[in-house]
Amino acid sequence: MDISSDESDDWFMESLNAYRDLHLFQLEHPTKVIEWMGDKSICVAGYTGARSEILELLLPLKLYAGDNQGLCAERDFKVKHGGFSEEPVECLIHIPGTRCLVTSGNSNTLQIWDIGGDDSDVIKMTRVINLKSPSAKGSKITPGFTDSPTVLHGSCISDIQLTEIATGRVLHTVGKESSDSVSGLQFVNAFVFLICSTNGALLLGDTRDPSTCHYPLEESNSGLRWSFGLRSDSSQSEPSCCKVARLSSSGHMLLSDLRDLKSPFCQTQIKVPQSASKNHFMNISWAPVLDKCLSVSGFDGTVHIYNTNNWSTESSSPQPIFSHRGHEMSQEAKSSTSPAVVTAHSWHPSRPKTLLSAATDGSLHVWDWVDKITDR
């Protein structure tokens, strides 16, 4: 998509009313991981080079200045800690309550990292966990809710296991032989976890039970890739509180809850570019604070936000309530031979309408959007 100067100027003028806050940053190398370290900092890591930088970035102080923004000069992200991985970083997660990161790349290992305190600016690798399966490259990772730090991880269904970080001891394995690739995985509560494969199937497991429940799609197109997002409250035991969204590379979307994973309570089709099925940055995410809002990216240089409140069992093609086009309007995108594609986006854990997004051109944005209906 070629962006003209006039179109870019028009977007800039529109953005003055479309955002409460909009801060743009340029990374030296693009990232496809954005991991929250709390309310005011994130971790990012490169994926394009043999040696990849891992950074902890403080969000712009101006974002938190409220009515005193005019008195705050800090508009940029600030590097707080940094380190280097000897391989591209495919997945990165933070262990809650610690200064520990876990990453995976193109080797069949997990790397454990320590983020220094106030007396050090270094992110240092402290141990490597060797995975037995030769196919365990680029493992998806999610933190466990156990007393000692653990991670659930795997690149294909049969490889998924729960591992204790301090010892490398395997605490649980998924009792299913399947070579299907993992699209994502996440804990619902302290014991129950959900896995989505790239063919759209869901698996529900429990660390207290060696078996898993398998929920394949009724109709599956082998040419499609699927991504998923889970919205849950670990303090809630009611299955209806956990919403699952699945999105295919053709734009087909399924919404389910844990009471009946076989039958989605809603399915719809969103508009996506025809060439979008070739990329692997597809991302769907529920808003943690706003009820029934979810976001989609990875098809082009845009992040779209949808309100699912009025979606029915067979909804017609819904329109986003907001679209962030900043990455395709950036100077880097205009000067590039290929259009920028959003590689990752993430909602702020406590600010209802604040998101971060990153793109293939190295751009990193934090933005607080305005809902033209509710914010009038």
UniProtKB/Swiss-Prot annotation:
Disruption of the gene: reported phenotype: Brain growth and morphogenesis defects.
Claim: Transport is one of the keywords in the record: no
Protein origin, superkingdom: Eukaryota
Major site of localization recorded for this protein: cytoplasm
Biological process terms in GO annotation: cerebellar Purkinje cell differentiation; cerebellum development; cytoplasmic microtubule organization; midbrain development
Any Pfam family matching the protein: WD40
Location relative to the cell: Cytoplasm; Cytoplasm, Cytoskeleton, Spindle; Cytoplasm, Cytoskeleton, Spindle pole; Cleavage furrow
Cellular component annotations (GO), alphabetically ordered: cleavage furrow; cytoplasm; spindle pole
Keywords for this protein: Cytoplasm, Cytoskeleton, Repeat, WD repeat
Family: Belongs to the WD repeat WDR73 family.
Role played: Component of a multiprotein complex required for the assembly of the RNA endonuclease module of the integrator complex. Associates with ints9 and ints11 in the cytoplasm, stabilizing the ints9-ints11 heterodimer and blocking the active site of ints11. Brat1 then joins the complex and plugs the active site of ints11, leading to wdr73 release and nuclear import of ints9 and ints11.
Protein name: Integrator complex assembly factor WDR73
